Amino acid sequence: MVASAPASAGTKGVIRQVIGPVLDVEFPAGKLPKIYNALRVEAKNTSGQDVALTAEVQQLLGDHRVRAVAMSGTDGLVRGMEAVDTGAPISVPVGEATLGRIFNVLGEPVDEQGPVKTKTTAPIHREAPKLTELETKPKVFETGIKVIDLLAPYRQGGKVGLFGGAGVGKTVLIQELINNIAKEHGGVSVFGGVGERTREGNDLYEEFKESGVINADDLSKSKVALCYGQMNEPPGARMRVGLSALTMAEHFRDVNKQDVLLFVDNIFRFVQAGSEVSALLGRMPSAVGYQPTLGTDVGTLQERVASTVEGSITSIQAVYVPADDLTDPAPATTFAHLDATTVLNRALASKGIYPAVDPLDSSSTMLQPAVVGDEHYRTARAVQSTLQRYKELQDIIAILGLDELSEDDRQTVDRARKVEKFLSQPFFVAEIFTGMPGKYVKLDETIAGFNQILAGELDDLPEQAFYLVGSIEEVKAKAQKMAAESK
């Protein structure tokens, strides 16, 4: 961490070279800024227009020069312009005042809602928590979403990869998780939009307002802070906006002592931005053109996402897989840090099973008897083996029909279909679209429900009674209602 009144603060340097987003700046002897210090350039360009940008020092070159990466466009910069050392890293606003607001990488509000009502800021660079500060005992983070809690449970203070194409329900799942942590855990969320489409960022903001996650009338009642560095922005912004969002989350954990959800969409773009500036910084490219510091860059970000004795940051990261190649260095490096994967499946979404989480592809390191207990583990494995058997039988059913199956296989198919339907669930944030009240299902209710289905206790209930409900009691009530209506 940089001292509060560094000797280099206010030192003026001169821009000597501009190559795309990278600047070389010369400072007086003995007054070089430190690595990660922010430099501020405020001047007029050749057309007489104001130029204002912030750059972050990345390298000390010798000959009193430093090399810095700009956080915004370098159009209009010319050699000879003045750059001032701020004496500290980029700092962003933190605390309750950030909720319901949208920020850029520098912590400046970009939502036209006026200035942020806080003087509390924090630098975006800091050390990961020490081992002695960490909560090392694995603890399941209950989401209230049946398919996740049963088959791929999240670890409190862990990291989850969210895989899924366009239109399969990533955003709705993210919104529901934000809603549930606010209601059930009294926690807040931070959303880091890293290198994704501007339209998606705007759509997400509007959907948050519609679903009540952001309260437009009283921002203090909002449950999420947003930090965007979009696809059209320079690589410097995309490379650092994840750290800006993480810094906001760390304040809620360490100072407010809350459980925080940190969403990063998309973690691949963070790596991509690093590779864009790597060559300009004079580093030799590594495998597939990525930066040689790939492992360090990802590790520095991921190790700060942790559960401490004060509170936890549970991170859910959308992971783009280039050309569906899981061996690509970017996703491969990310996978090493993940505790769980939630895979969204288009085939399930097309069947109307929401959330469209694939029960066979999703996985978690938490799903072991020593952590979740024997009953949970046995139930989860029984659900997966039933669904796997159903998947194997689908080709036979498609060709020969159900009647050609053995009695045991027919029973397996019947129960698997009920299990598949029961894995669906109405969401609070989708109430305005579905007209159905959302459901938060406790883990013990989830386990009890699936046990009853697999034990054959509900074989006489119609399949449709299991669709889009919460607990197993609602299934029974729905079945009774359906029976009464059919008379």
UniProtKB/Swiss-Prot annotation:
Q: Which InterPro entries match?
A: AAA+_ATPase (IPR003593), ATP-synt_VA_C (IPR055190), ATP_synth_F1_bsu (IPR005722), ATPase_a/bsu_AS (IPR020003), ATPase_alpha/beta_chains (IPR050053), ATPase_F1/V1/A1_a/bsu_N (IPR004100), ATPase_F1/V1/A1_a/bsu_N_sf (IPR036121), ATPase_F1/V1/A1_a/bsu_nucl-bd (IPR000194)
A Pfam family annotated for this UniProt entry = ATP-synt_ab
Q: What keyword terms does UniProt attach to this protein? A: ATP synthesis, ATP-binding, CF(1), Hydrogen ion transport, Ion transport, Membrane, Nucleotide-binding, Thylakoid, Translocase, Transport
Which cell locations does it reside in?
Answer: Cellular thylakoid membrane
Reaction(s) catalyzed by this protein? ATP + H2O + 4 H(+)(in) = ADP + phosphate + 5 H(+)(out)
Write one Gene Ontology MF term. Answer: ATP hydrolysis activity
Q: What class of enzyme is it?
A: translocase
The principal localisation class reads membrane
Q: How does it sit in the membrane?
A: Peripheral membrane protein
Asked if the keyword ATP-binding belongs to this entry, the reply reads: yes
EC annotation from Swiss-Prot or TrEMBL: 7.1.2.2
Q: Which domain of life is it from?
A: Bacteria
Q: Which CDD domains match?
A: ATP-synt_F1_beta_C, ATP-synt_F1_beta_N, F1-ATPase_beta_CD
Annotated residues that bind ATP are located at G164, G165, A166, G167, V168, G169, K170, T171
Q: Which GO terms describe its cellular component?
A: plasma membrane-derived thylakoid membrane; proton-transporting ATP synthase complex
User: What is the stated purpose of this protein?
Assistant: Produces ATP from ADP in the presence of a proton gradient across the membrane. The catalytic sites are hosted primarily by the beta subunits.
Q: What family does this chain come from, according to its entry?
A: Belongs to the ATPase alpha/beta chains family.
PANTHER family given in the database record: ATP SYNTHASE, ATP SYNTHASE SUBUNIT BETA, MITOCHONDRIAL
Per UniProt, subunit arrangement is: F-type ATPases have 2 components, CF(1) - the catalytic core - and CF(0) - the membrane proton channel. CF(1) has five subunits: alpha(3), beta(3), gamma(1), delta(1), epsilon(1). CF(0) has four main subunits: a(1), b(1), b'(1) and c(9-12).
Q: What is this protein called?
A: ATP synthase subunit beta
- The organism is Synechococcus sp. (strain CC9902)
Query: Could you tell me the gene encoding this protein?
Result: atpD
